[in-house]
């Protein structure tokens, strides 16, 4: 990838991968916590929610910057004992202050609306006094967009640049037009 000129790589790291030591020795620039659910509990995965939560949180010991969904109750746990710089995102203004994040490190989505225009669904929200549009409907896509915006900002990209990308983003096989 480096020989091909790639400067950034985005990858998913599973809690099972962490448990099985598949990322030992890898240092990440940024790690993102999007959500916590019960879908990884069972044979071959995690024995309990506590185990799942523990392994999911270990990723934040191997990164310089941690970005978290402040609307998820497990976000505080993810950043306990961790030495990375914390950034957050939320759809509720008060969450950043309640979870111990400095306001300058929290990106808040406001005035979220789901629209139908020309037979197509889209999502509009405001953050940092900017309007963002997504061709993808659903609040979970707002959370994913906030995570992407925070990540790109931490990498030095301008929010305007990131907003242009989000406006035209299509995920093949998911909610395609």
Label the model's feature ranges:
Residues 1, 20-23, 56-57:
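A generic local secondary-structure boundary/capping motif
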Residues 3-4, 32-177:
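Acidic, Mg2+-coordinating active-site environments of NTP-dependent enzymes
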Residues 6-18:
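Switch II (G3) loop of P-loop NTPases
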Residues 17-20, 74-76:
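Short, well-ordered alpha-helical microsegments
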Residues 18-30:
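ATP-dependent NMP and nucleoside kinases share a basic, alpha-helical "lid"
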